[in-house]
């Protein structure tokens, strides 16, 4: 598989920050074999989605996934060589005719889920001067390209990536990918977006990105990223988060996230000029925390991101709705509690309520986001209520096994025609196992 790597301004800027010469990393002395790890991750997932207005109202799927990830250490020397490899398999436990469609399993004819799907891949890697380079199948998580991990198996991307950590607290990264393997498929495909009515001919040939992440100041995190989805958009992201401890019991946490998205090249999805931001303020007192958030989309197209991915780092992105329609305003209240305060460590819960409003008569009709337009959508409103309960075993043979129960209720008025009324229940059991 060949990759046409183009040195865009993003990569020139990233390369300029990497030292030309530095002492070789001490951790490469671990060796190719001595520094190797093998981790297994088993996930059992059950999804029940009841969309009130859909042709298939009661969608139910249940599956078992397994992921094996091997990561070698590095050979000795100024430049160390290493190898990563992974294998995944997903098995259908339930999802018969007429009930498929929750997206944890691949779809087949007659609304039946396939019985099994699997994939394997790997990446070569080099490390030197505090810089790591990888080429092959990548697990990525950042604000402009993040593999989806909310289903049974994780999403991966095929391409190259480089990471530099020369300065304590500062991480620089960049890369370019040309294909993705979605979380419910075996094979790779070109990259498309989540909310557009995109045809295969409009898929992008590649995505390039570069960014910086700062965590070197106590209580402060900040990120700046830029990405080019070829012939679709340029997307820029920035965030700032600060945790201020008032005393040993109480802390305050304000934060802000901002995206700017602009069409580029052939503009395959049409004209895009979108600014989307969210702010949050959390008060934590002991084992309790309360969060208030506000989110706003400025633009006649929705805020969009990579299909089936998680690169929406916004406060009001919920289990069912992202509250990201054209020109939408939304707010959220959330309460979290850690039951360690009652002598039950490992048990936690979260309850949130979100509400949004948009004028969909102003949504663009001349782009691939035309489905959001509604001539009667001047007063489009919707809300979502989410309730999560999670338990992580603290000791014994089941240590680190977690059970997550999630329930969401979503309702919209007739003016919000692009989204369903929905009741959704999920059960996710994760068991990570470190072999060596």
Predicted regions and their residues:
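C-terminal structural cap/anchor segments
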Residues: 294-379, 384-390, 394
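Residues on the lipid-exposed face of transmembrane beta-strands in outer-membrane beta-barrel proteins
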Residues: 40, 66-72, 122-126, 160-164, ...
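Outer membrane beta-barrel
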Residues: 70-102, 109-190, 212-216, 220, ...
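Outer-membrane beta-barrel translocator/channel fold
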Residues: 91, 173-197, 201-203, 249-330, ...
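Residues that define the transmembrane beta-barrel architecture of outer-membrane proteins
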Residues: 34, 60-66, 116-120, 154-158, ...
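Transmembrane beta-strand segments that form the barrel wall of outer-membrane beta-barrel proteins
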Residues: 44-46, 133-147, 172-174, 210, ...
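Beta-barrel outer-membrane channel/assembly domains of diderm bacteria
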Residues: 2, 9, 20-140, 387-394, ...
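Repeated loop/turn-to-beta-strand initiation elements of outer-membrane beta-barrel proteins
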Residues: 77-80, 130-134, 169-173, 181, ...
């Amino acid at each position: 598989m060949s990759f046409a790597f183009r040195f865009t301004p993003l990569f020139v800027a990233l390369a300029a920050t990497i030292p030309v010469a530095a002492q070789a990393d001490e951790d490469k002395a671990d060796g190719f074999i001595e520094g190797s790890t093998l981790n297994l991750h088993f996930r059992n997932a059950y999804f029940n989605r009841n969309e009130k207005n859909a042709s298939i109202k009661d969608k139910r799927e249940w599956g078992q996934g397994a992921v094996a990830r091997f990561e070698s250490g590095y050979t000795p020397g100024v430049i160390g060589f290493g190898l990563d490899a992974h294998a995944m398999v997903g098995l259908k436990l339930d999802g018969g005719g007429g009930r498929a469609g929750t997206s944890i399993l691949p779809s087949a004819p007659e609304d039946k889920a396939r019985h099994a799907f699997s994939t394997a891949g790997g990446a070569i890697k080099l490390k030197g001067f505090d810089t790591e380079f990888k080429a092959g199948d990548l697990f990525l998580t950042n604000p402009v390209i993040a593999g989806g991990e909310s289903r049974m198996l994780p999403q991966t991307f095929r391409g190259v990536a480089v990471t530099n950590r020369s300065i304590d607290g500062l991480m620089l990264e960049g890369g370019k990918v040309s294909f993705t393997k979605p979380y419910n498929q075996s094979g790779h495909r070109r990259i498309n977006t989540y909310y557009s009515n995109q045809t295969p001919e409009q898929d992008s040939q590649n995505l390039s990105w570069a960014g910086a992440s700062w965590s070197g100041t106590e209580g402060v995190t900040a990120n700046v990223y830029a990405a080019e989805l070829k012939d679709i958009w340029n997307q820029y992201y920035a965030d700032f988060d600060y945790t201020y401890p008032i005393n040993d019991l109480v802390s305050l946490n304000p934060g802000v996230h901002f995206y700017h998205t602009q069409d580029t090249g052939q503009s395959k999805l049409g004209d895009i000029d979108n600014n989307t931001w969210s702010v949050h303020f959390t008060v934590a007192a002991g084992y309790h925390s309360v969060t208030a958030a506000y989110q706003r989309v400025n633009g006649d197209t929705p805020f969009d991101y990579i299909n089936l991915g998680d690169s929406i780092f916004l406060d009001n992105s919920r289990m069912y709705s992202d509250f990201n329609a054209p020109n939408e305003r939304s707010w959220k209240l959330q309460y979290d509690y850690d039951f360690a305060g009652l002598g039950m460590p490992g048990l936690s819960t979260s309850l949130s309520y979100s509400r949004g409003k948009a004028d969909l008569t102003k949504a663009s009709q001349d782009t691939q986001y035309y489905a959001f337009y509604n001539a009667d959508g001047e007063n489009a409103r919707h809300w979502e209520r989410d309730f999560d309960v999670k338990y992580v075993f603290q000791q014994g043979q089941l240590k680190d096994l977690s059970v997550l129960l999630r329930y969401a209720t979503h309702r919209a008025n007739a003016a919000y025609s692009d989204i369903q009324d929905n009741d959704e229940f999920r059960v996710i059991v994760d068991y990570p196992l470190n072999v060596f």
